[in-house]
């Protein structure tokens, strides 16, 4: 089911303090004033945990400028379908597309998104906005998502997985947040007392982007990867490297020795449920779930959860996989709506607008917000760890056919976690299938020797 609704203009917004926001943003933003009296715009967006904060930020924009915004709200798959239909029509229905990390490359490579600086050559990206693996840029000539390309979008929600852990248990045991995988494993085993308490609960279920997404911090944190160098156009498959084997062996061992017995059937809802009901000492979960931990209507561990960047192997940085959202402007809409969309993005990227996003429960895309007093408040204790992790976030896919690779990973990883096949067979099999995908789509690719 989808929801079409026009957000009303307000002169005063309860709970968000938007009265006077236009003046404040004008004083501290990129431009002294934001354009008013623009054409109304329509944004197609998905119904996600962060949507409410986005909606309230849009309301603040309307109050500050008087400009009108309509939100077309849909389930995850429904949003993608509507975007695909709109960009392929003679005249687009949606001015701003809220694109997920799994499909933004499709929109860039297909020429469906207009570069922001082509619409307004004077547009400047705020230097403190996270570029999230440079995924806001696209070099059409090289077909790469790299900073030498044009500015295609502005980040909306910089989602990455973080380590959620029971701070109260850590305090009692005299432990500090784990920085290495060895420390995480030792701590998970220490707290593992099933069925009342599991050392860690992981996702292992097969889905549209489920077990694969949870595996990325381990794969890249051990120094592995799926491809050799996407930014250079080298799609040689490296999944079945020694590092890849170490990562998958670790993931499976963690599940079997300190995890839930039904890891292979666990999806996001089950993982979150284990944490909020007090049955998990650790989970690796997208940061958007933070508010559920302190919601007394859902959680028995209110004020007991802490956050840390995902661990990594010694000498390597944390490597959370991006699962973020970007806002791009559709190419097939009238020029006046394109210009109005640019003004919204110009406003949205500012520190002041992003501070309002944080106050509304969202995840800011502006680095300066994480240095504000709000980050020292107990309620927002996740902000500083997130700020540490974001600069190291990994863009997993830079090509339009990513869904074909994800489907291969979902099957192979799920079977390995379930014990149906060995990690070696899983990695070799997935690598072979991914190599076929890349060859079929005419990418420069290669393969490693199979693991023994």
Task: Give the predicted meaning of each segment.
Residues 164-167, 322-336:
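A bilobed periplasmic-binding-protein/Venus flytrap-type ligand-binding module shared by bacterial periplasmic
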């Amino acid at each position: 089911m989808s929801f079409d609704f026009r957000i009303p203009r307000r002169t005063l917004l309860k709970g968000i303090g938007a009265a006077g926001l236009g003046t404040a943003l004008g004083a501290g933003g990129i431009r002294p004033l934001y354009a008013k009296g623009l054409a109304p715009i329509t944004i197609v967006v998905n119904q996600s945990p962060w949507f409410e904060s986005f909606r309230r930020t849009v309301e603040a924009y309307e109050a500050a400028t008087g400009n009108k915004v309509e939100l077309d709200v849909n389930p995850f798959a429904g949003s993608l379908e509507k975007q695909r239909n709109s960009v392929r029509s003679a005249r687009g229905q949606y001015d701003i597309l809220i694109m997920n990390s799994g499909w933004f490359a499709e929109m860039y490579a297909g020429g469906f998104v207009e570069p922001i600086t082509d619409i307004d050559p004077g547009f400047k990206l705020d230097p403190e906005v996270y570029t999230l693996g440079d995924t806001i840029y696209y070099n059409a000539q090289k077909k790469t998502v790299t900073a030498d390309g044009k500015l295609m979008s502005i980040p909306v929600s910089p989602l990455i997985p973080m380590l959620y852990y029971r701070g109260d248990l850590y305090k009692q045991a005299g432990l500090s947040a784990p920085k290495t995988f060895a420390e995480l494993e030792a701590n998970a085993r220490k707290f593992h007392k099933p069925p009342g308490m599991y050392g860690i609960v992981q996702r292992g279920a097969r889905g549209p982007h489920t077990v694969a997404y949870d595996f990325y911090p381990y794969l890249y944190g051990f120094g592995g990867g799926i491809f050799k160098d996407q930014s250079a156009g080298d799609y040689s498959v490296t999944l079945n490297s020694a590092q890849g084997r170490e990562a998958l062996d670790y993931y499976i061992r963690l599940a079997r020795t300190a995890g839930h017995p039904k890891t292979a059937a666990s999806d996001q809802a089950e993982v979150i449920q284990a944490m909020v009901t007090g049955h998990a000492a650790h989970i690796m979960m997208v940061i958007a779930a933070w508010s559920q931990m302190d919601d007394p209507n859902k959680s028995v561990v209110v004020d007991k959860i802490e956050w840390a960047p995902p661990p990594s192997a010694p000498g390597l940085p944390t490597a959370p996989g991006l699962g973020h959202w970007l806002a791009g402007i559709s190419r097939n809409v009238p020029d006046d709506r394109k210009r109005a969309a640019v003004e919204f993005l110009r406003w949205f990227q500012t520190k002041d607008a992003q501070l309002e996003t944080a106050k509304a429960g969202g995840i800011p895309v502006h680095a300066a917000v994480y240095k504000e007093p709000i980050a020292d408040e107990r309620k927002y204790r996740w902000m500083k760890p997130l700020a540490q992790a974001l600069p190291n976030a990994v863009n997993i896919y830079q090509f339009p056919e990513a869904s074909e690779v994800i489907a291969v990973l979902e099957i192979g990883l799920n079977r390995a976690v379930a014990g149906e096949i060995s990690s070696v067979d899983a990695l070799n099999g997935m690598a072979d299938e991914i190599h076929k995908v890349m060859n079929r789509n005419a990418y420069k690719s290669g393969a490693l020797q199979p693991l023994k």
